[in-house]
Amino acid sequence: WQMALKMFSIAQHYVCAIVVSSCHQLAATSCFTRKKTMSKQTISVFGLGSMGFGVACSALAAGHHVYGFDVNIASQDRFLAKGGDRAEIAEAGAVSDVVVSVVLNGAQTTDILFGETGIVPHMRPGSVVISCATVAPDLARELAAKCNAFQVLYLDAPISGGSVKAAEGALTMMASGSADAFAAAQPALDAITQTVYRLGDVAGPGSAMKAVNQLLAGVHIAAMGEALTFGISQGVDAARIVEVISKCAGTSWMFENRAPHVVDGDYTPHSAINIWLKDLGIVLDVAKGSHFSAPLAAAALQQFIAAAGQGLGGEDDAAVAKVYAKNAGLTLPKAK
């Protein structure tokens, strides 16, 4: 019995040591996965497009009171049919704990926050803006300072995951801002994200990280179009290219996600060509400002510009493959 007790004591010691070590490791990381909270908030979501609609519906599904805003009245009506709410901006601002901006760019973000009918002047002190658009880090810092003048908190919080993850409330967020901003936004973050990377206590790093992601994503999509059409030019079936390369070292998430769109001849815009003119433009502007050469990003941007010039700007970004196909005199698969 003494031996058994001794063995139990040793095992207990090691279990405690492992638990303590694990807790220290978790405390040291700045990546937080979603934990559902019971706190319910009033949330205003601006931009009910492919991403914003999913964000708004995820917040609604979590039990929050959600106002939806979009220049497209049909999108607002669609959200109302899901159980969302609509109000005048001043009214929504006065009662909102959180404002989530999921609009296209920095100009739209600035307008919905501080324009003629901007919402920030109507928000209560201590409420928070979660700004999800891809913008330059300098603009993120400027918007945070303007919010601070109204005693409104600001999270520089670009998102990734596409419309599917948005609808599932499982986005990845690259966020930076004060501890108070994170705390004020937490119930909303629990509803719309799977993982939140906390990248600093001021605005800017979140947008800088998103620029890194967009550089890679844009280059990978352009590379997908080039590789797939190159294979077709050599007489290889497009579907077989996707099947084989997806299991090889040369694959990428973007190849596996976008190449099937080309194989199916389906260019329904989940993420449009025009998005990349903006996002890679931001990447190159930021790079230029820091005297950093980004030739791959520049080359990818030229392909997206060419696609837009061919009238493909509103199509899915996989349509960049059409630029390569046209130059090579190839015919891509047609929609089934």
Language model: regions and residue ranges:
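NAD(P)+-binding Rossmann beta1-loop-alpha1 motif at the extreme N-terminus of oxidoreductases
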Residues: 31-102, 127, 195
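Active-site-proximal catalytic alpha-helix in oxidoreductases
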Residues: 168-176, 197, 203-234, 243-257, ...
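Interdomain hinge/lid region at the active-site interface
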Residues: 207, 216, 251-316, 336
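Rossmann-fold dinucleotide-binding core
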Residues: 134-214, 218
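Rossmann-fold NAD(P) dinucleotide-binding segment
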Residues: 90-102, 106-152
